[in-house]
Amino acid sequence: MKETNYNYDKKRFETFIDAVIAIILTILVLELKIPESELTSDLNTRQQLTHLIPSFVSYIGSFLLITGIWIDHHLLFLNLNKLTRKYILLNMLFVLSLSVVPFTTAFAGHHYLDSFAVALLFVNYVIMNILFGALYW
């Protein structure tokens, strides 16, 4: 398909990406579930929170990674002269990989002793970063 001379609104697209990232960060924190059993003592509370440590670790890692990507994406758009259809489609593939992060983060946090669950999170990170790197080409 031949690229037309249509001028895509760079600011509008950047705002869309910002909104998607904000939603992803919100979904990410919603995966941190409050324990459902009754908290009958301080010891019980501490024990239940201790069980959430792997989920918090995976959440913090994903949050920091997405924050760094958001900052870099902003810098990328500051230097972008023209927004093309191909660039938009590549960005949307990047966003697709980014939107899976809440699932893979929660999965790895809940199944932190399962190497497959942790590997799935890191594969998600790698794919996401490859697609993000492709935006610079």
Residue ranges of predicted features:
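Multi-pass alpha-helical transmembrane bundle typical of ion/small-solute transporters
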Residues: 2-137
